[in-house]
Amino acid sequence: RSRGLGDVYKRQTIATAAENRVLDQPAEESHTWVYDYRWPGRRGAAHCADIPMWFGTLGADTADRQVGPVTTTNPADPTAAVLEDAAGQTTADLMQSALTHFIKEGNPGWPSYNDLTRICMVWDEKPHAEMDCYKDARTTWGLS
């Protein structure tokens, strides 16, 4: 898919940060986790569009402009909302569970990023772990 210049630099920044974190770490000691947010929403996976998904603020003002149509689940509380797209709501639920796991356990519940596997979590219609999802940025910028 075609990427805008901002997306190219964002990917390069993430790849650089991840590579620098694991540079001198044995793979089994890695405490680095990387994700790639690809939920299409209304405007694609724009910068910060993942925040309502991570924090469950789907009913917040303007959140639906990023993540897609939402339905209020409690008329007394317009911020209580779920995505109308079932796959999107499942993705949001899984993202919130990963964040909670990270806070409680010190890891998000998916394999850590290391210089051997470079695993990252892909948040899209079918969330999954993927090997080296930032390979394009890593190799383009000569990171390894």
Regions found by a protein language model. Give the residues of each.
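Single conserved hydrophobic/aromatic residue that forms the stacking wall/gate
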Residues: 1-9
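Mobile gating loops/cap/lid regions near enzyme active sites that modulate substrate access
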Residues: 14, 18-144
